[in-house]
Amino acid sequence: MSARTLFDKVWDAHTVKILPSGQTQLFIGLHLVHEVTSPQAFSMLRERGLKVLFPRRTIATVDHIVPTENQARPFLDDLAEEMIRAIETNVQTNHIPFYGIGSGNQGIVHVIAPEQGLTQPGMTIACGDSHTSTHGAFGAIAFGIGTSQVRDVLATQTLSLSKLKVRRVEVNGDLNPGVYAKDVILHIIRQLGVKGGVGYAYEYAGSTIERMSMEERMTICNMAIEGGARCGYINPDQITYDYLKGRDFAPKDWESAVNWWESIKSDADAVYDDVVVFDAGEIEPTVTWGITPGQGIGVNEVIPTPESLPASERAIAEEAYQYMKLTPGAPIKGTKIDVCFVGSCTNGRISDLREAAKFAQGHRVAPHVKAFIVPGSERVKKQAEAEGLDQIFLASGFEWREAGCSMCLAMNPDKLQGDQISASSSNRNFKGRQGSASGRTLLMSPAMVVAAAIKGEVTDPRELLN
């Protein structure tokens, strides 16, 4: 058999059949559901008299709309309470494992599945959420899906999908101090564009990626979708296996599992549809200035002028200048910040909070800034508190919250007001993304968010290191 990529091997292993349309009917090994995209799917099942085919292959939690301050039931928001009750009823009726608030396992769906060992190499994973690509960090093929597809997976445990091309995205060399996985992925999206990955799965590789921890790899794969790729993945290795070993759902026959995981790695002579290579040493602490994740620059660069951009990017740039109220040619560094948020499925894990605490320790949040830290899961919160990270944040003037999606999106009480501008460790800076029709979002690493909170403006985090 000819050399194949991991994507080819996993796709082939999960192919049920090729449909008359040319699409593949693909078996889904793990289905993750939350309170926002599942109620309609369960309703459609009931309307058709269908049942959940494999309840144990679905895992449910609540994350998008849960408040991160007052979690007393019933919630103050009637719609939020209604949606939480709906998923509680649906999982009970269909015998689906559920991690609710206070269970010790609740959290952002893309945080809790990896930390419990549910996400494993060689899996196909689906979830009604764009950032399901996160799970590709383990060598899984993971897709975000729509509500009708959530229904399909619940009813059949399969999806009808067109096979993607594969682009190998290599990053080689050593990262400079103060440069993180978030900077790497923002740099990649800046260079390849928000539509550059359409029709592709991205295989992230190279010496830089190979040295990353699993949580850093999850940050990389989380934002594959922001570059247009339906999924992104990294070949599993010893770092992957060390992370998974001993977790709740790790395979009992460990040796056999590792042997299989080794066999699905991309062959050394696999042929890719495209290959791009980046030099890690050229990546700077990166911040977005516009209204797409591709509108990013190094923290010491100036906001691009229309003349400096390709003709194809000028229209969206003009839209961004107007919305963001930023001046072309002006430095991004020094931009005043109103709200600072560390959290999300991109950067709400324990390693993110440890790094944030390192920058916060011994400093105080600027008087005009509202700053808060939101752990990605109840487990992350418990671990952070065991390490005393919460006390560092509180002493520095940050708010310490309960687990949830929080200010990543405008579905819970954590929202921008008016034309406030936020420094955010999340993954999207679209217009109105954080709750205000005129609110503005600058994406950056947790370290840079903390630096911005302390200085009250966009700051090179390396200044705090020094």
Curated annotation (Swiss-Prot):
- EC number assigned by the record: 4.2.1.33
Record key words, sorted: 4Fe-4S, Amino-acid biosynthesis, Branched-chain amino acid biosynthesis, Iron, Iron-sulfur, Leucine biosynthesis, Lyase, Metal-binding
Its UniProt entry gives the catalysed reaction(s) as: (2R,3S)-3-isopropylmalate = (2S)-2-isopropylmalate
Q: Which PROSITE patterns match?
A: ACONITASE_1, ACONITASE_2
Q: Which cofactor does it need?
A: [4Fe-4S] cluster
Name one molecular function that GO assigns to this entry.
Answer: metal ion binding
Q: Can you tell me which residues bind [4Fe-4S] cluster? A: 345, 405, 408
Which pathway does the database say it acts in?
Amino-acid biosynthesis; L-leucine biosynthesis; L-leucine from 3-methyl-2-oxobutanoate: step 2/4
Record note on cofactor: Binds 1 [4Fe-4S] cluster per subunit.
* Stored Pfam families: Aconitase
| GO annotation, biological process | L-leucine biosynthetic process
Q: Which HAMAP family match?
A: LeuC_type1
What is the similarity comment for this entry?
Belongs to the aconitase/IPM isomerase family. LeuC type 1 subfamily.
Q: What PANTHER family does the annotation carry?
A: 3-ISOPROPYLMALATE DEHYDRATASE, HOMOACONITASE, MITOCHONDRIAL-RELATED
**What does the function comment of this entry state?**
Catalyzes the isomerization between 2-isopropylmalate and 3-isopropylmalate, via the formation of 2-isopropylmaleate.
Q: Spell out the subunit comment.
A: Heterodimer of LeuC and LeuD.
The protein here is known as 3-isopropylmalate dehydratase large subunit
Organism, by scientific name, is Microcystis aeruginosa (strain NIES-843 / IAM M-2473)
